[in-house]
Amino acid sequence: MKRLLAFCLLFFAALGQAKVPPPARSAADAEIQRAVAAFMQQYQVPGVAVGITVDGAERYYNYGVSSRKTQAKVGANTLFEVGSVSKTFTATLASYAQVNQQLSLADHPGKYLPEMKGHDFDKVTLLNLGTHTAGGFPMQVPTQVKTDQQLTAYFQSWHPQYPAGTKRTYANPGIGMLGVIAAKSMRMPFQKAMTGVLLPKLGLTNTYLTVPPAKMAFYAQGYDDKGQPVRMSPGALWEPTYGIKTTARDLLRFVEINLDQVKVEPKLKRAIDGTHVGYYRLGEMTQGLVWEQLPYPASETSLQANSSQKVIFESNAVAALTPPRPPQANVLINKTGSTRGFGAYVAFNPARKIGIVLLMNRSVPMDGRIKLAHTILDTAGGMAK
C-alpha cells in the first residue's frame, strides 16, 4: 500500500510539472479577443458583445463599456439596437401567420388593406415584400410621411420601377408593410403581435421594441460615425424594420432556435423553417424570407461582396427559383443590421450547428463589421467537431 501511495504521489507530481496543453477553446478565446481589440481600437468602438453557439454550447464575450458617460461595462443584460436584423423577426412573424393560415405569402396586400385595391401596390405579393422584389422602393419611407393617413397615401401613389420578381432592391418599405399585414391578419397591432405573441413564444424575455423604464439602465448608448451619442429615432414603419433592441444572449437563443438546437412549438418550428426557403438568386446569394444565404464556408470576399454598396443600394437582377428551394443545411444564413449608433451581425450554419451574434454601440463601416464577423465565424468553425 505504501509503495502504491508513493507511486501515485510521484505520478501526480510529474503530471503537475508537465506542460499540459491548454483547452482547445482558449486559443479561440485569444483569437477573438485579439480581433475585437483591434476592431475597437481602429473604429473607436466603446463596447462590443459577441455570442457563439457550437452544437448547443454557448460562449459569450463582452468588451468595453455600454456608455462612455457612465462607464457601465457591457454585460449579459446590455441592450443593443440591431437595426435591420429586426426584419428577421418580422419575417418569422409573417411565416408564423402563414403556418396558422391567417395569410399566404402568395396573397396581395389589398386582401388585408382594402384601401390598396386598384393601386399598383396591390399587384405585388406578400412574398415580393419579404424578398425585396416588389418593384423598387426607396431605402426608407420618405421623412415627410409621419401619419397613418400619409403612409396610406404614399403606398397608394407608389409605382414600380420594374416588374415584380425581376430585380432586388433592398429597402425598408416592403418589409415594413409585410409586418403591418402580418399583424393585421392576426387582428392586432404590430407591436402586440411581436411583443405579445412572437417574442414570448421564442422565449426572448429581454428583447423589446420599446425598452421599458426598468430596463433603461441596461440600454447601451449608441454613437454615430463621428462619435456623438445617438439612439434610433422612430419613423414610419420603424417597428418591423429596425425597432428591435436585444441582448447577445437573447439574440443567440434566436439563432439556436433557427438551428433547431432550442425546441419550440411545432407551428413555430415550421414558421422558422419557412424563413429559410430560398426564392431568388443574386450571384452567390440566395434570398430567403429576409434571411440571406451563401454557400458554406463563405470567404470574407464573398461576405464583403454580398454586403457591398452595389447589393445594398442598387437594383440588381435576380433569378426566381422555381420551385422555391427548400431549406438547406450547408449554407451560411446571415443578416446585417445597423442604426445611426449601433451595428449588428447574425450568421449561422445549420449543417455544423454553429452560429454567431455580433453587437456594437457605434456606427462602423460595413466592411469593418464584416471583417470582424468573418474572423469570429472562422473561429467558431474551428470550435466545431
Swiss-Prot record:
GO biological process, one term: antibiotic catabolic process
Protein name: Beta-lactamase
Lineage: Bacteria, Pseudomonadati, Pseudomonadota, Gammaproteobacteria, Lysobacterales
The EC number(s) this enzyme carries: 3.5.2.6
Catalytic activities: a beta-lactam + H2O = a substituted beta-amino acid
Keywords associated with the record: Antibiotic resistance, Hydrolase, Periplasm, Signal
Family annotation (InterPro entries): Bact_CellWall_Synth/Modif, Beta-lactam-related, Beta-lactam/transpept-like, Beta-lactam_class-C_AS
Positions bound to substrate: K335, T336, G337
NCBIfam families in UniProt: bla_class_C
Keyword Hydrolase listed: yes
Organism: Lysobacter lactamgenus
PANTHER family reported for this sequence: BETA-LACTAMASE-RELATED, D-ALANYL-D-ALANINE-CARBOXYPEPTIDASE/ENDOPEPTIDASE AMPH
Range of residues in the leader sequence: 1-20
Active-site feature positions: S84 (acyl-ester intermediate), Y170 (proton acceptor)
Entry's Gene Ontology molecular function annotations: beta-lactamase activity
